[in-house]
């Protein structure tokens, strides 16, 4: 097998379209419905879970999960290391499967895949504040499905972790870079699996105000200061507009503070366009080369 892209085929009735579940940038292992048992991302692993006549596409999409992150996830932000690529997926309907079948849109254009993660970036534009970086990301899902059939976010409230660089929060997880008019983490974004608002996923950042370093809690809230979901294939940018006062002296105090820290005024912009850049475009579009068909038939 090529080890990068797989297409799983299931036999359909005579009048039905074939549903091609395309998984690109695939991991080398997966978990099925839990965080305990791993399976190889190959025909043997799939065959262990795909029960002929029993397993539906919905079942497979619901249970096909990434490998779980550790608790806590120390110094590890998924898919941010050198050479790591982000899993992506697409569900394509075709009316037949043979040597003439093309993996493309009906107009001949390449398929635009859906990323399995969300992206978060912090930008500081406040003149009275200096963003140092991200210290921790709290209440982060440990796993995510490789593809969602219904578009709903998986209930992972009991399967959470946190990103941090060390146990004492003594160093930054993500360091901000200087940009024109402020600082930004664009060059080192935070990736995470889609997260329900009930998880209360939030960031702890470090910044300088009035000549001193403080910690601030940044919740994922909308314009009405209501918690919101973090969805796959979406980019979230926090823009700090102004600092109203000091934050907290310790990370623990910041973690225990109210969900929306009133010491910072910030805006959250959400980009759900398929074209926002997470990885290079050549990893984002699926062509017909380097693809493997694994056919399951009766």
Q: Model segments located where?
A:
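Tryptophan-paired
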Residues: 1-46, 112, 119-232
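Low-complexity, acidic Ser/Thr/Pro-rich "mucin-like" tracts of secreted and single-pass surface proteins
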Residues: 219-298
């Amino acid at each position: 097998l090529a080890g990068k892209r797989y297409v799983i085929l299931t036999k359909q009735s005579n009048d039905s379209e074939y549903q091609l579940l395309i998984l690109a940038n695939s991991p080398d292992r997966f978990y099925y419905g839990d965080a305990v048992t791993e399976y190889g991302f190959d025909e043997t692993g799939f065959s262990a879970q795909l029960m002929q006549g029993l397993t539906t596409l919905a079942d497979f999409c619901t249970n096909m999960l990434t490998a779980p992150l550790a608790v806590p996830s120390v110094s590890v932000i998924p898919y941010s290391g050198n050479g790591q690529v982000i899993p992506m997926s697409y569900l394509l309907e075709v009316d037949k499967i043979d040597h003439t079948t093309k993996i493309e849109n009906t107009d001949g254009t390449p398929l635009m895949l859906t990323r399995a993660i969300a992206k978060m970036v912090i930008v500081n534009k406040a003149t009275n504040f200096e963003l140092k970086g991200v210290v921790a990301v709290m209440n982060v899902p440990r796993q995510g499905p490789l593809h969602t059939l219904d578009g709903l976010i998986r209930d992972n409230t009991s399967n959470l972790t946190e990103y941090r660089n060390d146990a004492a929060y003594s160093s930054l997880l993500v360091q901000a870079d200087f940009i024109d008019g402020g600082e930004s983490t664009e060059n080192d974004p935070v990736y995470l699996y889609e997260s329900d608002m009930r998880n209360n996923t939030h960031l702890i950042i470090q910044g300088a105000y009035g000549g001193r370093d403080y910690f601030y809690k940044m919740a994922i809230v909308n314009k009405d200061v209501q918690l919101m979901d973090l969805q796959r294939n979406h980019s979230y940018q926090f823009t700090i507009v102004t600092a109203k006062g000091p934050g907290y002296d310790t990370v623990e105090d910041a973690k225990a503070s109210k969900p929306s820290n009133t010491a910072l005024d910030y805006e959250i912009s959400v980009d759900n366009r398929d074209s926002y850049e997470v990885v290079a475009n050549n990893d984002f579009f699926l062509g017909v080369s380097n693809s493997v068909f694994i056919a399951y038939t009766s």
